[in-house]
Every structure is written in C-alpha cells, then in structure tokens.
Amino acid sequence: MQTAEPDIKAMNAMGYEATVLGNHEFDNPLQILDMQEKWANFPFLSANVINTKTGKTLVKPYTILNKQDLKIAVVGLTTEDTAKLGNPEYLHNVKFEDPTTVAKATLKELNEKVKPDVKIALTHMGYYYDAKHGSNAPGDVSLTRNLDKGAFDMIIGGHSHDPICVDDKGVWIKDYQPTQPCKPDFQNGTWIMQAFEWGKYVGRADFEFKNGELKLVNYQLIPVNLKKKVKKADGKTEYVNYAEEIPQDPEMEKLLKSYQDKGDALLSQKVGKLNGKLEGDRTIIRFEQTNLGHLIAEAQR
C-alpha cells in the first residue's frame, strides 16, 4: 500500500548497512525500486540480477564495509525463481542469472582487486536443509556446496522464512522454539544463518577475527516479544513472553505513526462481505486448493 516507504525509513533509523533484492521487489514497476533506493541510506545489492538494456547489474553487486581495520565484502544474490514469482509485466528487461556462476566471478574479482578480510553473501535464495530444494531453485546450501570451501565466510539468507538452527550433530531443528540454544548450519566452510520472518527475531552472530581467521563465538535468535500460552495454578491460561520484553522505542513509534494511521485508514475500507473464513494458512494454501486461492484466481481472470 505504501511501497515500503515506512519499512525503509525504519531500516534507516535502525542503521541497516545493506539489503538484497528479493522476489517481491519485482511485484511493482522498476520505478518503485528506483524510488526505494533513493529513500534508503544503504545500498540495494544483487550481483545476479541484470538489466538487459544496459547489460549491467540492476543494482550494485556488492558493497565494502570497513570495520575495525577489516575490509568486509557483502555480495548480494537473488533466487532465480524470481523470474516466475515476480510480476511478468515488470520483468521484460530483467534477467536472473545463475547465482553460483555469478558468485564465482564476483569472488574472483573481489579477491583480486579488493582482497577483503571477510566475505559475506547476503542472499534471498532460501534455506533447504541438505540441499533438498525440490521444485524450488537451489538455495544457500547448494550455493556453498558448489563453491570452493570457505569461499564465503558466512551467508545471511532469506526467502524461505526459516529460523536456521541446527543441533550439535548438524541436524536442522525444524520445530525450533524461542530461546532454544542452537547454532547456524555449517556447510563446506561457510556459516549459513537466517532469522525467520516478519521481525519475529533479531539474528545475532558474534565473530572473532584473529590471525587471518574468523571464528564464530556466539549465535542467537533473539525473540521480539514472542509469547507462549501457559496454564496457571488456578487452571486459567495466560500469554507470557518467552524472554525479557523489549520495550517499544518512542522515536521509532513517532517516525512510523503517520504511516500506521494511513495504513489503518486504507485497510478499514469495506470492499465486500464474507459468509465464511477464507483459508490462507501457509501450511495449507501452498499445498492444496482453498477458497482463497479460488477467489484470487477468479479475480485475476
């Protein structure tokens, strides 16, 4: 509704230093993406999304961050599935190249020209445990396995909406619960991390760089006021935080209040009537036909 303006303004306030193009950046005309880039105080990245008119990347392929005398290269990579997930009306002059092939070429350029101390892939490709991606385009695990060992020090990913936590044996904890101790996946010398979806967690990874080597010291998925239902002694139930409550930031609230009010006004407009529930649960609608799917298909005919 608001072309991600409040999202980007909030990301500016939080100090984001980079973001990667995902499939939803191509739901709208590219002019919207241009406008979003202007709003942002940080670069939009993707090394494998090509503007076929110019033959160049649509946005910056990578950025270099300088932290405590370290050169940190951050490379953006986007799922090839965007070609079928994005709005075809806006993809005429856009090509999505193979992320692995592009990563190899980009790393070669970085290693020769920049010589970074740390190399990070910021991806929107998805996490598919043991590279079992099914009908989806290959994700982060496939990427690491098809590159040289440790080609990237770490991958910070998205797209599949997963909390990446593995146990001591390296097995993915599918039913991860907030505050449960865990560590990121480690594939072919590369740490793979993802902090679930929709701001439910803040992902934190602490690394130590010493004598040219990077070592993971700590990894956390910090729940943002997520609650669980507990039964009290009197038999009644209540919802309590999994972890210490994170207080609302008054400056952020002030920044976003007008956008919230505008969104509420748009969402409160009556557009029709329902006689029953529209089934949109992800675990159902992505695997079988539902009345919501039928409604959307009819609307698009």
Where are these regions (language model features)?
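Non-catalytic terminal accessory segments
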Residues: M1, V224-R301
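Acidic, metal/ion-coordinating pockets
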Residues: M1-N225, F287, L292-A299
